Structures are given as structure tokens and as C-alpha cells.
């Protein structure tokens, strides 16, 4: 325990207090609310029931004044809870809802600024350059394509949510020693109407909290996941004969795309990748026997070693959650599978290993004989069932995959409808360019194309056949081109990463920095 304590204190030595006064600065809430300030850094603004920016700024000023008043926040939250429970929608409910959202967004902006400064300082100290070609989500698949061929076992791990908010506050306390700010956060989380139930009840409560407090929810969850992996590295160092001499670990930051290679040894490489935590985050390390990759709340643990080694790491995860985070996690949820007979879903692809059997005729002097060889091949395919499920939830088709019209888009112009469907189709083609089997992707494109035609026909109160016969089928052809022809319409074209001569099947592009919405919800 003393060694662990020293390990934690060493990495957390850089702390910056005095953040609490920033909650009373108007520009903090302007950063959280302004859509046009910098769309590449900040997420969508807080929706305030039709109020414009000037009115919202006035409300922020009133909020700051009321925070100064004693016991206001307590009464506001209590009023908000009662009114929501009773279904009342009046001025008090509006102000409380707005206050809750803005306080949540303001707190998240403050801590994001803190950790962004630390990240920039780390880059300057280590003289690390940001390689843009490593920003792409597809940059992980060549790694998997190269390493999985030689591994034996794999485990899917779903990282559980913490069961109590106090654990999250204690994690932040190790990084942010500003006591007033942490007390304010603790008070806000305790009094928020759905917080306690969100941590221990069905997914609906999690969904409500994450929707109303997106930035704060992501930051707290990623702080918890970062702490898990921080301790995981410690366990990795203690269990390895090839000790890591240095490493870096960051809380998942929005729009910081880096891949940092800290240490090269004869048989060891440790890599950290940070990505936009609203769409996907990579974090992985590898050594001769263990490989770990994570995307959001799902992790993949693969090994070249024995089943006993995988079992050891399985119980490392379970004990970490039970004894450090006080969360009871059943060990049977982590299943150990042989990679040769298992397919796993990761970042929009169904990945597996296929065995290729071939016979080679060998001739030596006057004798000839046949040699049977078996080679492994990395297979990444489009998960058709998952994508159809996402299309069904978005009301583009039925559960069985039958295309239907999109009623909510019938108020748009014809060009806007076609552009929306076309953009979805092109983005899917671009994102799944690495699939070795395109038949499933063609089916998804067909569903979107026919759904577009049905939507247009519904808007004009006609049938699909009559509508296409009147305007011509060429109307849709322009917007549903192949991925290679449509790249210039989406993003600046960049050189794809073609791995080991597999250009006919796997093409990994280096300009994909966000997960496709359909993939993210599948």
C-alpha cells in the first residue's frame, strides 16, 4: 500500500487550486453556451426553451447574483425537484432548470480548462508533436490487424459505473485540491433530482442525467475510468519483469488527438491514445503477452499467453473494482474466449480471425510432396444487424429492415431531404471502408436510399414509383455515389492506410476523427 500511495502522489503532484471563483465569471457560462465561438472545441450549447443569447446572458447574470445569496441554491434545487415531480411548468421551474444546466456546464468548462493546460504543458515538456495522421479512429485497426494474428485469448470487458457520487468526488479531490469547488460539486450532485437513482437504477435514469448534463456527466465518468486505468498500469508494472520506467495517462479530453509512444524496449511498448470522449476514446498498452484496448466503456483484453494468465488479469479487474471503488462486480461477466473461435464488436466492426487453408507443392530433386499450411487472417465486417437496429430506432426502417419514410423530415425541402440521406450514406461508406465484405454495407445503403424515396413520396402525397417516374431515378444517383467518389464532398481527401497489401479488402482512412452516429448507437 505504501508503494501504491507513493505511485499515486508522484503523478498527481501538479495541482492548481483557486478554481471556485471562476464560477462567478460570466465568460465561463458564455463559453458553455455560445455555439459559434469554436465549434471544434465545445459541444452543443444548452437549450433554453426558445430564449435567445441576449436573454440567456441576462439569466446567467441573475444566476451569479443568486448564487451569492445564502441558501438560494438549496431552495432552487428543491423547487426544481418538486415542480418536475408534479409536472408543473412555470417560471420557477424554468429558472431552476436553467440554473441546473448552466452550473453543470460551467463546472465542466472550468475543469476542462484546467486539464487542457496540463496537457499542453505536458506536450511542451516532453517535446511531443501532434501527428495528425494518428488522429483517425481507423489508426487502431492496423494495430489489431497486425497483433491479433498472433494472440490466443480475448475478453470483452464492460467497465461498470460507480455506485456512489462520493467516490467520484474523492477521485477529483486527488487532482483538484480546491476545497470550495469540490464542496460545491458534492452539494450539487447530492441535491440534483436524479443523481442517486441514476447511479443504481435502470438505464433510463442514466440517460436523463447524461442528456441534461452532458459535459459534466462525461467528465465525471471519464475521471473514474481514468482512475481505473491509472491503477491498472500500476498492477501491470508490478506483475511484469520488464518494468516500465515512464508512462503517461490523461483523463479523456475532448478534441485532443494524440498518440504518444513513451517507451521502446526489445519486447515492450506502451502507448496512450486520447480522443474526443463524446464519440470514442482509445487507451491501450501491449507487451509480449497482454494487449489492452478501450473504446468508451468497453475494453478488449487479449493475450498470447495461457488461459491462466488471462484468468489472473480477470481477477485483477474484479478486485480493483471491489476493493478500491467499493463496487461488487461478478467475475462471470468477464468471459475468456479463444480468439480463433470468437467474434467481438468493437468500434463499429465485427472483428474475428479466419483460418486460411492452402496447399503448397514442394519439389526437391526428383521427389515432390504437398505441404498443407494454415494462416490466420484478420476479418472486419459490417455489423448489419446492429446497424439495422440503429436505423429502426431512428425510424428509417422496421425492425426487420423494411425501409419506411421519415415523417419528421417531410417539412424540409427536397434538396435538404436528399442531402441528409446522402450524407448518411456517404459517411457510412467512408467509415466502413475497412470491411472485407461489402454486401452488408450495400444493404444498409439500399435501406437509406429507399427510405429517402418514401420520404419524398410522402411529402408530395404520391407513391414511390410515381414520384421517381416523374422526376427520374437520376435524382438520387447524384447523392448516393461510392465512397471513393464522395470523399471530396465530406472531408479533405487524405492518403488511406493500406496494410500489408490488403488494399482490395481493408482500407483504413486517416481522416475519420468522429464515430458515426449510427455506429455509436448500435
Curated annotation (Swiss-Prot):
| Any single biological process term in GO | mRNA processing
Any one Gene Ontology MF annotation carried by this entry is:
RNA binding
**InterPro entries listed in its UniProt record:** Domain_X, Maturase_MatK, Maturase_MatK_N
Location of the protein in the cell: Plastid, Chloroplast
Q: Does the keyword Acetylation apply?
A: no
Any one GO cellular component localisation term in the record: chloroplast
Q: What does the UniProt keyword field contain?
A: Chloroplast, mRNA processing, Plastid, RNA-binding, tRNA processing
Broad class of where this protein is predominantly found: plastid
Q: What does this chain do?
A: Usually encoded in the trnK tRNA gene intron. Probably assists in splicing its own and other chloroplast group II introns.
**Family in the record:** Belongs to the intron maturase 2 family. MatK subfamily.
Its protein name is: Maturase K
Lineage of the species this protein comes from: Eukaryota, Viridiplantae, Streptophyta, Embryophyta, Tracheophyta
Amino acid at each position: 500500500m505504501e508503494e501504491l500511495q507513493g505511485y499515486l502522489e508522484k503523478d498527481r503532484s501538479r495541482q492548481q487550486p483557486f478554481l471556485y471563483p471562476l464560477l462567478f465569471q460570466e465568460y465561463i457560462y458564455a463559453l458553455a453556451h455560445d455555439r459559434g465561438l469554436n465549434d471544434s472545441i465545445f459541444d452543443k450549447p444548452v437549450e433554453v426553451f426558445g430564449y435567445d443569447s441576449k436573454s440567456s446572458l441576462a439569466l446567467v447574470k441573475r444566476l451569479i447574483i443568486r448564487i451569492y445569496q445564502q441558501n438560494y441554491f438549496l431552495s432552487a434545487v428543491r423547487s426544481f425537484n418538486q415542480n418536475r415531480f408534479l409536472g408543473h411548468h412555470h417560471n420557477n421551474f424554468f429558472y431552476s432548470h436553467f440554473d441546473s444546466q448552466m452550473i453543470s456546464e460551467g463546472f465542466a468548462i472550468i475543469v476542462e480548462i484546467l486539464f487542457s493546460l496540463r496537457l499542453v504543458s505536458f506536450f511542451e515538456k516532453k517535446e511531443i508533436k501532434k501527428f495528425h495522421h494518428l488522429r483517425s479512429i481507423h489508426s487502431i485497426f492496423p494495430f489489431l490487424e497486425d497483433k491479433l494474428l498472433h494472440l490466443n485469448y480475448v475478453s470483452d470487458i464492460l467497465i461498470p459505473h460507480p455506485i456512489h457520487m462520493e467516490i467520484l468526488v474523492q477521485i477529483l479531490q486527488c487532482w483538484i485540491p480546491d476545497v470550495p469547488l469540490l464542496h460545491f460539486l458534492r452539494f450539487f450532485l447530492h441535491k440534483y433530482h436524479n443523481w442517486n437513482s441514476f447511479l443504481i437504477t435502470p438505464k433510463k435514469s442514466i440517460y436523463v442525467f447524461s442528456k441534461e448534463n452532458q459535459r459534466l456527466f462525461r467528465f465525471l465518468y471519464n475521471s473514474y475510468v481514468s482512475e481505473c486505468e491509472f491503477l491498472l498500469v500500476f498492477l501491470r508494472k508490478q506483475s511484469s519483469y520488464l518494468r516500465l520506467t515512464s508512462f503517461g495517462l490523461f483523463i479523456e479530453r475532448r478534441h485532443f488527438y494524440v498518440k504518444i509512444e513513451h517507451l521502446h524496449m526489445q519486447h515492450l511498448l506502451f502507448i496512450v491514445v486520447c480522443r474526443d470522449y463524446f464519440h470514442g476514446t482509445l487507451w491501450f498498452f501491449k507487451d509480449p503477452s497482454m494487449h489492452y484496448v478501450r473504446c468508451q466503456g468497453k475494453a478488449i483484453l487479449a493475450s498470447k499467453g495461457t488461459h491462466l494468465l488471462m484468468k489472473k488479469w480477470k481477477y485483477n479487474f474484479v478486485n480493483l473494482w471491489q476493493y478500491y471503488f467499493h463496487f461488487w462486480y461478478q467475475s462471470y461477466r468477464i468471459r475468456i474466449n479463444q480468439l480463433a473461435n470468437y467474434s467481438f464488436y468493437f468500434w463499429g466492426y465485427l472483428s474475428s480471425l479466419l483460418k486460411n487453408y492452402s496447399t503448397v507443392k514442394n519439389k526437391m530433386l526428383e521427389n515432390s510432396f504437398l505441404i498443407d499450411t494454415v494462416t490466420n487472417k484478420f476479418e472486419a465486417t459490417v455489423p448489419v444487424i446492429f446497424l439495422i437496429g440503429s436505423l429502426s430506432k431512428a425510424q428509417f426502417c422496421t425492425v426487420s429492415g423494411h425501409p419506411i419514410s421519415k415523417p419528421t423530415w417531410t417539412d424540409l425541402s427536397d434538396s435538404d431531404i436528399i442531402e441528409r440521406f446522402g450524407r448518411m450514406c456517404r459517411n457510412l461508406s467512408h467509415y466502413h471502408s475497412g470491411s472485407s465484405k461489402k454486401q452488408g454495407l450495400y444493404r444498409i445503403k439500399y435501406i437509406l436510399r429507399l427510405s429517402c424515396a418514401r420520404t419524398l413520396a410522402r411529402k408530395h402525397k404520391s407513391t414511390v414509383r410515381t414520384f421517381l417516374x416523374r422526376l427520374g431515378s437520376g435524382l438520387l444517383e447524384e447523392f448516393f455515389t461510392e465512397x471513393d467518389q464522395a470523399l471530396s464532398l465530406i472531408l479533405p481527401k487524405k492518403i488511406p492506410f493500406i496494410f500489408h497489401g490488403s488494399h482490395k479488402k481493408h482500407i483504413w482512412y486517416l481522416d475519420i476523427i468522429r464515430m458515426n452516429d449510427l455506429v455509436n448507437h448500435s
